[in-house]
Amino acid sequence: NSELKSMFRLGMYQAGQFKALTAKGMYDYFQAENISDMSMGWGDRLAGFNASKHGKYYYGTDPNTLTYNNYHRQHDFYDTGKEIDIHCEPSEDLTKPPKHSIDISFTSPPYFNREQYVDEDTQSFMRYVTIDSWLNDYMFKTIKQQWNYIKSGGVYAINISNILNKGEWVNICDPINEYLNTLDGSKYLGHMGMKIAKSPSIQLRKDVDCSLAEPIFVWQKE
């Protein structure tokens, strides 16, 4: 699908390395009407929802108090008439369920302690200082909760990557996919590469022609 591929290219370095067109491409490809996002970040996937062909309802949360009001301003600016149901609390603590069964849950959580956007005690890197606690008490709890809200035939998709921390690689992708594999009715559909530009923190050999990409893992609930 050439249109979908074009939406997965990130032509310049952006904060968070996420592109609203990627979200729009995912929503349109799966013809999703009801969408959830448990780490809203800078509102990129909210923008993709408002631009999508099929999106009608967006259920999301992010604990960052500095961005919450801006989500509403952003949505009002688009003036699409679509419904949003957003919250300002940690995803693992969110107890209010969505109003509708979810077609796709698509998110890009912070990569353990690599992304630190605000110094608030509700941030996952502040709450969970080891990778084991971050996975078990934050990621797995959030994934399980969202999985329960996804309708049969719906999709869970996550943009996540392993990270280099103090000179050692931290394995994030494998534990998350292994956990998803244990959930009732889970079926691995595959992964897509979201092309990213060179980060200021990445050094590449000048004689090597290569592209950088981050994976989006896609699972279906049967």
What does each model-identified segment do?
Residues 1-222:
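Class I S-adenosyl-L-methionine-dependent methyltransferase catalytic core
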